Amino acid sequence: TDRRVSDENPKWLANTQDSVTSITLLRELVEEIGFSPDGKGSLELVNEEIQEKICIDKEKWAYYVKKGEIKIDNFNSQIIAVRTMPPFAPIRFTNTFHHLSIGDSKIEPRFPKGMSEFDEYRWWKPENLLQSWLNHEVRLPPPQVTLIRDICESLEENGDLISAFDKLSINPSEGYHILEFAPGVECIPLPTQTLPPATHTNCYVLGVPGGERVIIDPAAKSKEALEILSKKIDEIRLSRSEIIATIFTHKHQDHIG
């Protein structure tokens, strides 16, 4: 839908890095929290009826843009990070994280009636969110964990959020990042001869940098898998951690290395 809308309206959001991605972002913003550009570089809350109709029919987003009831002029976003999930399955997902400013509007998200993916929202300082995750008080998907770490690091270096996001947007982080399902639980997908359609076995590293570590199911046999595992072991040692145990959960050939 969004690609077709972009093809049919090539001037829409042509000033952004990727017009298709920007159209998807703006449509999803309306659907999920009722936000849309205000035409002045900030965001506003759209009419609730418009939000509901777009939730029912995605085609309606372009319809309301053409009618002028949804604005896209002067829309600005900063891409601050890109995360591509490791090969858990044949289809991999890429997450692109944007920074959008709401300025002084003080708008509050509004979830669609009866069809929201969310239970609640909260404005959260990055450092407090990271600490809450470390304390097992909230759960975060792995891509968001490394994103929050990047934001906290940039915030410490640059002093305020706007400066932190400006710095991150210059060279958005992407490529290799550790995959943490929980504090002290890191996953390393290793290519193995496992049962199709799977292509990898999940090796786990337990523990935190500087502390004792345990490796579970390091099923590396191929050159590629051995290189991945070797780099991870070097990374662990550089963090001044000690590997105190290796555990194999069972004797299947795709779990033994």
Regions found by a protein language model. Name each.
Residues 49-108:
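Active-site-adjacent beta-strand/loop module that shapes the phosphate/pyrophosphate-binding cleft
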Residues 74-81, 94-103, 110-138:
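NUDIX/MutT-family hydrolases
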Residues 156-170:
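Amphipathic alpha-helical
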Residues 225-257:
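Active-site metal-binding motif and surrounding structural segment of the metallo-beta-lactamase
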